[in-house]
Amino acid sequence: MDEKTKKAEEMALSLTRAVAGGDEQVAMKCAIWLAEQRVPLSVQLKPEVSPTQDIRLWVSVEDAQMHTVTIWLTVRPDMTVASLKDMVFLDYGFPPVLQQWVIGQRLARDQETLHSHGVRQNGDSAYLYLLSARNTSLNPQELQRERQLRMLEDLGFKDLTLQPRGPLEPGPPKPGVPQEPGRGQPDAVPEPPPVGWQCPGCTFINKPTRPGCEMCCRARPEAYQVPASYQPDEEERARLAGEEEALRQYQQRKQQQQEGNYLQHVQLDQRSLVLNTEPAECPVCYSVLAPGEAVVLRECLHTFCRECLQGTIRNSQEAEVSCPFIDNTYSCSGKLLEREIKALLTPEDYQRFLDLGISIAENRSAFSYHCKTPDCKGWCFFEDDVNEFTCPVCFHVNCLLCKAIHEQMNCKEYQEDLALRAQNDVAARQTTEMLKVMLQQGEAMRCPQCQIVVQKKDGCDWIRCTVCHTEICWVTKGPRWGPGGPGDTSGGCRCRVNGIPCHPSCQNCH
């Protein structure tokens, strides 16, 4: 088949498609060309051979790394393979030059229709293989030019070449430079190599300032550096300005959120009590508490009702009130803060709590002295070089050596008078003798801290001194804990340390 006959067949097919598609301009151009060439034609009407309704095509996609994925495409049987490639390019970003279609076990060509390959109903399958683009220099300009040429080919113009906009007027020939025959225009200036970084995944050439691939969104190589002399174009400047504005708004919103959180914490810290914001259950009385009805302890975040916390404070024998939470695993060692206690109690109960703390501090100190005036609350911490204490409450002078008030007598006169009165006081003498017998028989003992006489009524071997509140092990006649207080096993009886009781006769000293 000669070149003229082949060209005539192509123009006839283009005329057929233009008439079927209603394109008057293309049909007129094809008809004029056929008439000028005096090509013999036979025109006849025929029914529609390719259905035009939309169907769903099942496509298996595989790349050069043997990664496979299945997708569904909505197509028409009269679509060409070139149109199918353009659709995949627009929807998924894979350039047509990288697409290789296999339909009906045949390699599909661009100008062939899907109907010619047997794609006629829903569920028909096709195979798409994505070629590696490592050896292909892709850029947006070439992709756009290829797409325009493909659209012209669909219209029947296969031998056209896209030229830049505006007329190109050849200049006068230079003297002394002969022109080669057959060449009416000078050679086109080759385009400079594209500036940018090549995506390691799809090999697309991206602009230097872009942080990720425009095609596959892969991150820019860390080793790439933007050329110092590079000037971004208008599109890049707009994108960079948008990124800067987004970053500024993000930083502004973050700062506003931080300031709001700070103000919220300041307002929360100014409150004496932290109330619950969600429904909770008191672990002591098991009452279900609505938001705002319970108190959340600041130190340990355990939640209780007000009544249980008030009862815990009133019944506490310590200056520091512990959290009442306890279960089968552990008991909480957190403490209630002073402002929490003050907010929970009435003024009278809070004053009693303060008095209890002062009393405990006085009794637990080895250098404290309480005024001997009956019902007087005055006391002090004394030093070795001080022998007298003037009570700030009752204003009586206490002798720290005799531990008594003898304002009209000196120490010698007072002790002689005391011995004389003891000989004549039968009740005082009987009490002294009874205490001595109890100490000798082991029915009583002296507190290892304040030396007062204490005794155990019944039950376990743990007792507490009523004066200095020292915890005592009855069976060892010594303190239960070390100098650090409850839980300090560096001293005391060290009961149950390594599972060993403090004494063979120990009856649980806690």
Curated annotation (Swiss-Prot):
Pathway: Protein modification; protein ubiquitination
UniProt: Zn(2+) 5 binding residues: C447, C450, C465, C468
Sequence segments annotated as region (Interaction with RNF31): 69-131
Protein name: RanBP-type and C3HC4-type zinc finger-containing protein 1
Zinc finger (RING-type) residue numbers: 282-332, 447-476
Family membership noted in the UniProt record: Belongs to the RBR family.
Lineage: superkingdom: Eukaryota
Free-text function comment from the UniProt entry: E3 ubiquitin-protein ligase, which accepts ubiquitin from specific E2 ubiquitin-conjugating enzymes, such as UBE2L3/UBCM4, and then transfers it to substrates. Functions as an E3 ligase for oxidized IREB2 and both heme and oxygen are necessary for IREB2 ubiquitination. Promotes ubiquitination of TAB2 and IRF3 and their degradation by the proteasome. Component of the LUBAC complex which conjugates linear ('Met-1'-linked) polyubiquitin chains to substrates and plays a key role in NF-kappa-B activation and regulation of inflammation.
Subunit structure, as described in the record: Component of the LUBAC complex (linear ubiquitin chain assembly complex) which consists of SHARPIN, RBCK1 and RNF31. LUBAC has a MW of approximately 600 kDa suggesting a heteromultimeric assembly of its subunits. Interacts with beta-I-type (PRKCB1) and zeta-type protein kinase C (PRKCZ). Interacts with UBE2L3. Interacts with PRKCH. Associates with the TNF-R1 signaling complex (TNF-RSC) in a stimulation-dependent manner. Interacts with EYA1, TAB2, TAB3, MAP3K7 TRAF6 and RIPK1. Interacts with IRF3. (Microbial infection) Interacts with hepatitis B virus/HBV protein HBx; this interaction is required to activate transcription of the viral genome.
Annotated positions binding Zn(2+) 2: C300, H302, C323, C332
Domain notes: The RanBP2-type zinc finger, also called Npl4 zinc finger (NZF), mediates binding to 'Met-1'-linked polyubiquitins. The UBL domain mediates association with RNF31 via interaction with its UBA domain.
Residues passing through the membrane, by range: none
Reactions that this protein is recorded to catalyse: [E2 ubiquitin-conjugating enzyme]-S-ubiquitinyl-L-cysteine + [acceptor protein]-L-lysine = [E2 ubiquitin-conjugating enzyme]-L-cysteine + [acceptor protein]-N(6)-ubiquitinyl-L-lysine
Domain Ubiquitin-like: 55-119
Induction of synthesis: By viral transfection.
GO BP, sorted A to Z: defense response to bacterium; negative regulation of necroptotic process; negative regulation of NF-kappaB transcription factor activity; positive regulation of canonical NF-kappaB signal transduction; positive regulation of extrinsic apoptotic signaling pathway; positive regulation of NF-kappaB transcription factor activity; positive regulation of non-canonical NF-kappaB signal transduction; proteasome-mediated ubiquitin-dependent protein catabolic process
Region called Disordered, residue ranges: 160-192
MF term (GO), any: transcription coactivator activity
Residues covered by region (Interaction with TAB2): 1-270
Pfam families referenced in this protein's UniProt entry, alphabetically: LTM, zf-RING_UBOX
RanBP2-type zinc finger locations on the chain: 193-222
InterPro entries: BRcat_RBR_HOIL1, HOIL1_RBR_mRING-HC-C3HC3D, LUBAC_E3_Ligases, Rcat_RBR_HOIL1, TRIAD_supradom, Ubiquitin-like_dom, Ubiquitin-like_domsf, Znf-RING_euk
CDD domains associated with the record: BRcat_RBR_HOIL1, mRING-HC-C3HC3D_RBR_HOIL1, Rcat_RBR_HOIL1, Ubl_HOIL1
Phenotype upon changing C285S: Binds to IREB2 in iron-treated cells. Reversed iron-induced down-regulation of IREB2. No ubiquitination of heme-loaded IREB2
The enzyme's E.C. designation: 2.3.2.31
